[in-house]
């Protein structure tokens, strides 16, 4: 599975002009399941997303995770948005191939699993809508962006 995480001051996702998820300071994670991914891969990726130290401590060092945004235990928001295009094969030609992405039904199942697991482990989880045409707005903080990937 893949997650492109961005440290944000705020972010929201809309579907048909309706806000489906919004957060203040925290992480926006674009999430993609690849062919052959499993719940175990989703669990490993979620552990990375929740524990990845991308927020600055008092010394200005990236030493804090979304679960401890300010060093005093305050959790930040986590906005999860499905994005199958992260699995694109761009090695040949000028048109991406999405063959590496999980089929839609499997991608939805794993994304839903990822969201449920996140909600069980983190207090502030918002989402987009799987398979929908979404508009994502964010104020990137830094910018700080990382590509996280786990293998099946």
From Swiss-Prot:
Pfam families the UniProt entry points to:
Tyr_Deacylase (PF02580)
Family of this protein: Belongs to the DTD family.
A molecular function (GO) term: tRNA binding
EC? 3.1.1.96
Q: Name one GO biological process term.
A: D-amino acid catabolic process
Assembly and oligomerization: Homodimer.
Q: Which UniProt keywords apply?
A: Cytoplasm, Hydrolase, RNA-binding, tRNA-binding
GO cellular component, alphabetical, reads: cytoplasm
Enumerate the InterPro entries for this protein: Daa-tRNA_deacyls_DTD, DTD-like_sf
Q: Kindly report, in one word, the top-level EC class recorded for this enzyme.
A: hydrolase
The chemistry this enzyme catalyses reads: glycyl-tRNA(Ala) + H2O = tRNA(Ala) + glycine + H(+); a D-aminoacyl-tRNA + H2O = a tRNA + a D-alpha-amino acid + H(+)
Motif Gly-cisPro motif, important for rejection of L-amino acids: chain residues: 142-143
- Alphabetized CDD domains for the sequence: Dtyr_deacylase
The principal localisation class reads: cytoplasm
State the NCBIfam families in the record.
D-aminoacyl-tRNA deacylase (TIGR00256)
Question: Which cell locations does it reside in?
Answer: Cytoplasm
Q: Which organism is it from?
A: Paraburkholderia phytofirmans (strain DSM 17436 / LMG 22146 / PsJN)
The record lists the membrane-crossing segments as none
How does the record comment on the protein's domains? A Gly-cisPro motif from one monomer fits into the active site of the other monomer to allow specific chiral rejection of L-amino acids.
Please list the disulfide bridges: none
Q: What does this protein do?
A: An aminoacyl-tRNA editing enzyme that deacylates mischarged D-aminoacyl-tRNAs. Also deacylates mischarged glycyl-tRNA(Ala), protecting cells against glycine mischarging by AlaRS. Acts via tRNA-based rather than protein-based catalysis; rejects L-amino acids rather than detecting D-amino acids in the active site. By recycling D-aminoacyl-tRNA to D-amino acids and free tRNA molecules, this enzyme counteracts the toxicity associated with the formation of D-aminoacyl-tRNA entities in vivo and helps enforce protein L-homochirality.
Gene for this protein? dtd
User: What is the name of the protein in this document?
Assistant: D-aminoacyl-tRNA deacylase
């Amino acid at each position: 599975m893949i997650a492109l995480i961005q440290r944000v001051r705020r972010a929201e996702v809309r579907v048909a002009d309706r806000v489906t998820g919004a957060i203040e300071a925290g992480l926006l994670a674009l999430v993609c399941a690849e062919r052959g991914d499993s719940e175990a891969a989703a669990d490993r990726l979620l552990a990375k997303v929740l524990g990845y130290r991308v927020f600055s401590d008092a010394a200005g060092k990236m030493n804090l995770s979304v679960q401890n945004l300010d060093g005093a235990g305050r959790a930040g928001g986590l906005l999860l948005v499905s994005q199958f295009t992260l699995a694109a094969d761009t090695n040949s030609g000028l048109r991406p191939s999405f063959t590496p992405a999980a089929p839609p039904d499997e991608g939805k199942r794993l994304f839903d699993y990822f969201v449920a697991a996140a909600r069980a482990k983190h207090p502030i989880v918002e989402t987009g809508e799987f398979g929908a045409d979404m508009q994502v707005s964010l104020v990137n903080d830094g910018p700080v962006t990382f590509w996280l990937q786990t293998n099946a």
